[in-house]
Amino acid sequence: MAQLFTKIIVYFLLFASPLLANQWPLHNNSLNDVVQWDHYSFEINGQRLFVFAGEWHYWRIPVPELWIDILEKIKAAGFTAFGIYVNWAYHAPNNYTVDFATGAHDITPILKMAKDVGLYVLLRPGPYINAEVNAGGFPLWVTTGEYGSLRNDDSRYTAAWEPYFTKISEIASEYQITKGGNVVTYQIENEFGDQWTGSPSRRVQYEPAAKYMELLEANARRNGIDIPLVANEPNMRAISWGKDWSNSSANVDVVGLDSYPSCWTCDLSVCTGTTGEYIAYQVIDYYGYFQETQPTMPSFFAEFQGGSYNPWGGPVGGCPEDIGPDFANLFYRWNIGQRVTAINLYMLYGGTNWGAIAAPVVASSYDYSSPISENRTIGAKYYETKLLTMFTRAARDLIVTDLIGNGTQYSTNPAIQTHVIRNPITNGTFYVTLHTISSSSTDETFQLHVNTSAGAFSIPRYGNSIRLNGHQSKIIVTDFQFGTHKLLYSTAEVLTYTVLDGIPTLALWVPTGESGEFSVLGGKWASVLRCEWCSDIQFHPEQDQTSNPTVSRLTVSFTQGQGMSVIKLDTGLRVVLLDRESAYYFWAPALNSDPSVPEDQSVLVQGPHLVRSAKIVGSTIRLTGDSAQTSPIEVFAPKQVRIIFWNDKELKTSKTSYDSLQASLPQPAYVKLPLLGPWKYNGSLPEKAQDYKDTSAAWISADHMKTSNPSPPATFPVLYADEYGFHNSIRIWRGYFTGNATGVVLKVQGGYAFGFSGWLNGKLLGSYLGNASVEHSHLTLPFNVSHVSTSSDNVLVIVHDDTGHDETTGALNPRGILEATLLSDNSSSKFSHWRVAGTAGGETNIDPMRGPYNEGGLYAERMGWHLPGFNDNAWSDAGSKLNFTGADIKFYRTTVPLNIPKGVDVSISFELSACGTTNAFRSQLFVNGYQMGRFNPWVGNQIEFPVPPGILDYTGDNTIGLSLWAQTEDGACAIVDWKINYVLGSSLDVTFNGEYLRPGWTSERLQYS
């Protein structure tokens, strides 16, 4: 019956005339009507909202004091919400602990800040999240096979996730919109398109998946979640969990789509191998998909491409330009033309894969080519995205639209296509224009055929043609309502507007040097009160001859060079004309915490690098933000405002002829970093010695003769590190044997870019250096007969560095030694026993502040040499050199002070490079105890490693450590330097006391020798 009903709906939607807006059913989850939705959009507390969100992950920036920086940058750009994954593994170091209290593990500050800043929250707690994170966010203790194949209704898996999911649901429930908070949706699972056996069109349900979803949904509801439950489709083929597609009891309230139309990785060859030829800027038809699969729900992207991750072996510095500002310009506008009214950009801020957070597909950086860079920089992509997000927040008519038509018939140039969407209630219309072949970057000009309340005609009527130059799109509006005024049309794009003292101020923009034309109903004449590189301004007053002959209108054509111009109409309306660069630095900070920002609850500010907030008290406006240099600032505010405070300092202010306020921002303080060094060092591989005693608390007998893992080893005992509670990074194996063995066959698996080295009785046998596209290595290592002892135990030492656990079904792929076979002339040699060491304390999580991802099993890590407060007085001096010969592992330390002044935001990165004659080494960068980067020059190209304040102590001493693992007898040589990414005058306090984030060394570490 559900099939027939759905087919009837889809047929009607695709071939009948558009329904009236009030004829579409308004849905809720039957628990309340606080969050509702229909065919057009979400509605929150009775108000429709264009949900433009961006994703970020608190666990990739584990400094709570910096979360406000990310949220303020999201808000300032015009976003109305943010998405956030909660990472089960980060909070559950073992199967008896769920930590939502220690340091950055406490997410409640984020949920409180969201309310204060004025952003809705799309909370995404998994339990599986993918996210290019180790095992997709599964705690690594569930990867052994002991909990089944995962992501089903297996009772063992259910028992694993329930404590975590119960706790996060309890926490989130207190911050829901229904209880006065700002959490508006709750995503169940992630990209779990497994509802159907075979084609979704057959609708034969896969019961283990459906029952799993029912368990998750019931748990959320039982623990207080009463907002809509959401699922996200991994692609346009899965069609799972949607009520418009089936009547399954496992369905959620609202379904969103995940789409990455450009390559999701900086390695374009990966996309070519998966989806065929990669064509940059090639768009996808989403309108038909949404109409067919979820016609009574909003067209909703739970994830839409915000960038691409950089894999091991990817290009230095990240992705090519086809994922930059032009991508944001074209693809996000394309989505508007597809009637999308809810988008979550993945990622808006990527952050860092510190410790062992990363899955094997990605290195330490999770910059993701995001609008906000890993080092917290905002640049061209952020500003280009802001041009649209400010518009979607201001364009109320955009929230309810029907697709009127699409094609080349709307343009005088066949090289241009147009999608026309119209609000059926207000007649506000949006013409989304782009190249007919979307991948084209030709320079095209055209007129647009529009149908307005004043009749049908082609625009511009007087000025120069509309221009699309390069990979660009433009949204041309007609009958655009703003305040009490209506824009009959504008070939310049609308940036934003606000209503001050009852009269709107409208901001329009064009690319630098281009022309625009706008027509305002009700105007008769206007004056140019500021002309900064403007030209060709013409005024054309006329009477409306169609709808109302008594209504006048004023049409203005112009060309705008670099700068800002201001025109004032006889109605009092101010129109601010901006070129692209000036629009980048034009802001509309809200005066209250309503995410939708009512039209009379913002001011307009031109000039600063960033405007974080605005508050008016009497005649004073208090602005906070960032400034890069001495620069002008201009504020459009209510007439009562006469005084500007910037970051709590009063500015010398003057008033313009068009009633704005002008002032100058001061130069930020000068900051210089001290030199790193001198360095001290110590050996960090005593385990390779034949007589090393592996009897401390660090070591466990690797003696399992069976495994729950679905992939059994070729030889026994089981030498899978996770079996013994060691899950991260470097693990050290010691295998004992007697007899006349001549070599060993080793198969080691550790994920893309992993590596290992082997020593026999202290002598190097060989190494696997790693490969960015290979997950395991099968080597035969011959023994030098002179190194084999015939009278005592021989010890084979394997140092194995994995790069994380695979995602999705690959989470159970073992990490460790899959085969260890001794070779001998008489085949009698066998290993007598094995010992293994990994993270100090194993799963007991002896460093709860930094958490379960931070450390591996290197001797230096187990002993705490990377931690502040460790006494290295007895170590050897290295001076400024970090180099040695021979196949070994050494650890280097230095302490360096910082004294960053207040009033500035400073971003710092470390730079690592190889020196000497070899790059066959692996290294880890530690900053005040945090592993902030893996530098593996044989495999990867990442050389820059940002470290945020809080991890760095900006007003005290900092302990910097580097492990160097030489995989050949040539040794290793590394250079460590650091640099300032930016210094900005800022309201953000980066000199806060973050000592609690940097717990120091204790003697407890001595037991893990």
From Swiss-Prot:
Family: Belongs to the glycosyl hydrolase 35 family.
Keyword presence, Kinase: no
The protein, known as: Probable beta-galactosidase B
Catalytic residue list: 191 (proton donor), 303 (nucleophile)
Underlying gene: lacB
Glycosylation sites: 28, 95, 247, 375, 406, 427, 451, 682, 740, 771, 784, 826, 883
Leading EC class: hydrolase
Function: Cleaves beta-linked terminal galactosyl residues from gangliosides, glycoproteins, and glycosaminoglycans.
SMART domains given in the database record: BetaGal_dom2 (SM01029)
UniProt main location, coarse: secreted
Disulphide-bonded residues: 266-319
GO cellular component: extracellular region
Keywords per UniProt: Carbohydrate metabolism, Disulfide bond, Glycoprotein, Glycosidase, Hydrolase, Polysaccharide degradation, Secreted, Signal
Membrane-spanning segments: none
Keyword RNA-binding among record annotations: no
Binding, substrate: 85, 130-132, 190, 260, 368
Short name of any one Pfam family annotated for the protein: Glyco_hydro_35
Annotated signal sequence range: 1-21
EC number: 3.2.1.23
InterPro entries: Betagal_dom2, Betagal_dom2_sf, BetaGal_dom3, BetaGal_dom3_sf, BetaGal_jelly_roll_dom, Galactose-bd-like_sf, Gly_Hdrlase_35_cat, Glycoside_Hdrlase_35
Source species, domain of life: Eukaryota
GO process terms (BP): polysaccharide catabolic process
Taxon lineage: Eukaryota, Fungi, Dikarya, Ascomycota, Pezizomycotina
One of the record's GO molecular function terms: beta-galactosidase activity
Catalytic activity: Hydrolysis of terminal non-reducing beta-D-galactose residues in beta-D-galactosides
